[in-house]
């Protein structure tokens, strides 16, 4: 890895722990202005003050989300998009370039690929192209890889998740985001098969905050490099406190019980 990528990665990860708490806020394209990100600047402010390492935004939200004050936070510009209104919502297309992201001040870029989807061929082609350009510009690449399509019966199947993680590594990502399998033992398959850092996705909004923290702890026990969780952070009762609680687990190795005290 070149020094350019190393320097930029330190802006989206904790330099001491080499772990990260990333909060995606790119849901506006896929689902509209959902609860928690209606006002993007306020949403960024809350998670930044809580200690998140980075946020994921689409290019048009960078200016809207820039605070110009308070605690600094890493910026990851998302390059992929589709909407929930599409009959082929699993087929992501590129809507931004690495060069655009650089001009916007990004510390990294992210791409979304759904293996098994009808549009897999084009998404993999885009992935390969983006990773090439990222290497040229020394821009870190976060790959969000999911198993979604006619042949995927369960996207949380350990073998499917491990396949997703390996695809991210094979095609040149620097960090890969995949679903959590449900327990540390099976999630280790994804960790062991990936030579790059693996972070977990948060998925749909969970019923309880304790459940979210238990998922985070399980992933960390398996060897994850952190998390990339959206709705279970920005739709929490207090997003800043939720990030602080997660930080205790991710960066300090604390227990769920210790982390949960912050949320009481």
UniProtKB/Swiss-Prot annotation:
UniProt-annotated binding residues for 1-deoxy-D-threo-hexo-2,5-diulose 6-phosphate: 26-30, 146-148, 202-203, 230-231
This enzyme's EC code(s): 2.2.1.10
CDD domains reported for this sequence: DhnA
Keyword Transferase: yes
GO biological process: amino acid biosynthetic process; aromatic amino acid family biosynthetic process
Gene from which the chain derives: aroA'
Active site residues of this protein: 26, 146, 177
One Pfam family from the record: DeoC
GO MF, one annotated term: fructose-bisphosphate aldolase activity
Record family assignment: Belongs to the DeoC/FbaB aldolase family. ADHS subfamily.
Source organism, top-level taxon: Bacteria
Catalytic activity: 1-deoxy-D-threo-hexo-2,5-diulose 6-phosphate + L-aspartate 4-semialdehyde = 2,3-dioxopropyl phosphate + 2-amino-2,3,7-trideoxy-D-lyxo-hept-6-ulosonate
Subunit structure: Homodecamer.
Enzyme class: transferase
Name of the protein: 2-amino-3,7-dideoxy-D-threo-hept-6-ulosonate synthase
Keyword Transferase attached: yes
Function: Catalyzes a transaldol reaction between 6-deoxy-5-ketofructose 1-phosphate (DKFP) and L-aspartate semialdehyde (ASA) with an elimination of hydroxypyruvaldehyde phosphate to yield 2-amino-3,7-dideoxy-D-threo-hept-6-ulosonate (ADH). Plays a key role in an alternative pathway of the biosynthesis of 3-dehydroquinate (DHQ), which is involved in the canonical pathway for the biosynthesis of aromatic amino acids.
Disulfide bond annotation, renumbered to this chain: none
This protein's UniProt keywords: Amino-acid biosynthesis, Aromatic amino acid biosynthesis, Schiff base, Transferase
């Amino acid at each position: 890895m070149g020094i350019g990528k190393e320097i930029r990665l330190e802006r989206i990860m904790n330099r001491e722990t080499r772990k990260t708490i990333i909060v995606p806020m790119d849901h506006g394209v896929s689902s509209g202005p959902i609860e928690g990100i209606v006002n993007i600047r306020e949403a960024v402010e809350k998670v930044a003050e809580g200690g998140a390492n980075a946020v994921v935004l689409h290019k048009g939200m960078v200016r809207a989300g820039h605070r110009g004050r308070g605690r600094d936070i890493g910026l990851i510009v998302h390059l992929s998009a589709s909407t929930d209104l599409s009959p082929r919502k699993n087929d992501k297309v590129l809507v931004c370039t690495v060069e655009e992201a650089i001009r916007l001040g990004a510390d990294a870029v992210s791409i979304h690929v759904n293996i098994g989807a009808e549009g897999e061929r084009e998404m993999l082609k885009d992935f390969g192209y983006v990773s090439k350009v990222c290497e040229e510009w020394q821009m870190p690449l976060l790959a969000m890889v999911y198993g979604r399509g006619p042949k995927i019966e369960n996207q949380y199947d350990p073998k499917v998740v491990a396949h997703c993680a390996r695809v991210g590594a094979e095609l040149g990502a620097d960090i890969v985001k995949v679903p959590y399998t449900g327990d540390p033992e099976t999630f280790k398959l994804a960790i062991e098969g990936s030579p790059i850092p693996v972070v977990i996705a948060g998925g749909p909004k969970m019923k309880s905050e304790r459940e979210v923290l238990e998922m985070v702890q399980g992933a960390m026990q398996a060897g994850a490099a952190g998390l990339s969780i959206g709705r279970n952070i920005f739709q929490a009762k207090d997003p800043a406190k939720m990030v602080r609680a997660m930080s205790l687990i991710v960066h300090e190795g604390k227990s769920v019980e210790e982390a949960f005290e912050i949320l009481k």
